[in-house]
């Protein structure tokens, strides 16, 4: 078990902060000395001003009736159609249901399962005692050799649901390293692949079979060497897996099981062509397949048809009457103007430094700027986004996982599937594109059967129309009001800091431009209207006193969903 620690950074600023200070000091002696003094004064003033705010964001949160706002009629029909598509279940009639209203699975214990001795020993050592509903419903048919198409809420325990049968299959067939790869698990992101690999390694600790991982950004040559030696259970991201299938000499002709996890996410980020090529290359004779997806879309159904054998078992543990988010999750939103967004975020984080918090932003450059800024003013945070090198992403992910408290600022790269322990708050600083993205973000907290957590979403007055979409998606929300006198008034000090610090100034401009580009690419145009933004106020939230020029690709080829996330 990894030893739990606090997120590093309390005693020293981030690497970026060091660079900022170094570069600042390289200017002329007169300019650099005065600049360093100014920056130190600004940081002191930020803390002093904050300390004057008593009882900040404590128990004074009010819960009035939610507001409403009229929307443009021009795109109403288009957005209504999108709303229906986002919230309506789309399960093919060709996939049989298996009567999921039965709750008899609630008390199924692992100790009563008929698993091999090495697997049972590992499960006991990992501390698992009772199966979740998806595990109790999925494991028996998979052990019997059925193909399964599974739908489950995030945090439902589906990783064990497919790993245990896969490992039992390797054990029963007495697979050896020289037999090559017999199980392949495909997942959308590197972080999720690392997480699944970690669980697989623990489950296989008493087995003789081998497991491995191939992901983008890792050392390809080392991966190829391990594959050639024999990896029985392989966890992979689509692009890197296809690369090895085409260019690396390793044995996969004995493939007996294929698992596709987070299938909807794989397709959303643009791996549809790669998946079709992978399935075409992999042997399908006597191959058992399992496909898991949080949402069932037409594309997911198409992928299921080409990857699963005819007549798969459809398992859905999300009752139609249920809300779309976890029962132990308290959800709220706050309405504030663009220029007050960072002030409110800073105040909230400052009051909750003893908590474990994930803050979601819409772009890599916004994450980069706000993490640099917060670390510079001695509010230590970690950051995670798609432009980072893989080693940095891996180190950050595991550091935050092992921390008892801390703040992670990230893009949606951390929003799907990742099991980060004991997250207290999910803060959606930049709004999600649609209800599905919202649900996957808040799914990082209140995980498991007894999980508890809270979420807070920031909205400007012009974005209140998004609440209607969340209501249709069965997401219960309350409005939180934070009185103006309870928010730290540090705007002048923030502006001074950004103006006098060259690297922070450049980072702020990059973050501002990226925020607007992401905003312009939102799918719900009647909710997220770029022309409704007050650019002066938006730039103020980045500490800028002048509005930078931005070229927006509205309606062009640039899209929000990209492979790099």
Swiss-Prot record:
Subcellular location: Nucleus, Nucleolus
Coiled-coil features, chain-numbered ranges: 26-85
E.C. code: 3.6.4.13
Major localization class: nucleus
Regions of compositional bias (Basic residues) in chain numbering: 1-11
Catalysis: reaction(s): ATP + H2O = ADP + phosphate + H(+)
Top EC class for this record: hydrolase
Acidic residues bias spans: 96-106
Segments for region (Disordered): 1-106
PANTHER family: RNA HELICASE (PTHR24031)
Subunit description: Associates in the nucleolus with the 60S and pre-60S ribosomal subunits.
Family: Belongs to the DEAD box helicase family. DDX18/HAS1 subfamily.
Protein's UniProt name: ATP-dependent RNA helicase HAS1
Species the sequence originates in: Candida albicans (strain SC5314 / ATCC MYA-2876) (Yeast)
